């Protein structure tokens, strides 16, 4: 499978584009209601499902972002959920930890436009604690892959 994002670099001014995004996308906290997202400059596009694949763009306006480490996705109770992130604009990093504590950081992958981090789930789709962190204001794409038998949620 492949995703092609046409025209992702076709804008005149990055700051103007990101301001337009903030004006049109709701905050991730307003959509998801997760306490770790409260008060953070983190915005999300409407999620689009194509079969078992979910696509959501996120605008990370706050530097640092501090969305908090997480490893579970409550909307998918079926084992086998997978997810990767692709940097679209700006610079960020995907951080992985052994515990829900940034002091246990064991891998930090810098991400530039067009880059997808390596899969961070094991053969049984278990995740480490992880978070996206900004280096600059950013837009990234989260691609969620549901296992067979899971029904895409209405988020």
Segments from the language model and where they lie:
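A short, N-terminal "cap"/entry segment at the start of jelly-roll beta-barrel domains
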Residues: 1-59
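A short hydrophobic beta-strand segment most commonly corresponding to one strand
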Residues: 2-11, 128-153
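A mid-sequence, solvent-exposed acidic-amphipathic segment
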Residues: 57-81
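Short, conserved beta-strand element in jelly-roll/cupin
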Residues: 79-98
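Short acidic-glycine-tyrosine-enriched beta hairpin
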Residues: 96-134
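A short, polar/proline- and glycine-enriched secondary-structure boundary/capping micro-motif
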Residues: 104-107, 151-155
């Amino acid at each position: 499978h492949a995703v092609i994002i046409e025209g992702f670099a076709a804008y005149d001014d990055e700051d103007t584009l990101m301001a337009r995004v903030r004006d049109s996308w709701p905050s991730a906290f307003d959509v998801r209601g997760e306490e770790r997202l409260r008060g953070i400059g983190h915005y999300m596009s409407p999620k689009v499902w194509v079969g078992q694949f979910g696509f959501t763009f996120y605008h990370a306006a706050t530097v640092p972002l501090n969305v908090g480490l997480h490893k579970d996705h409550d909307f998918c109770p079926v084992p086998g959920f997978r997810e990767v992130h692709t940097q679209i604009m700006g610079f960020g990093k995907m951080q992985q930890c052994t515990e829900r504590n940034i002091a246990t950081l064991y891998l930090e992958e810098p991400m530039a436009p067009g880059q997808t981090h390596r899969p961070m789930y094991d053969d049984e789709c278990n995740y480490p604690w992880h978070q996206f962190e900004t280096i600059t204001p950013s837009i990234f794409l989260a691609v969620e892959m549901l296992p067979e038998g899971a029904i895409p949620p209405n988020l």
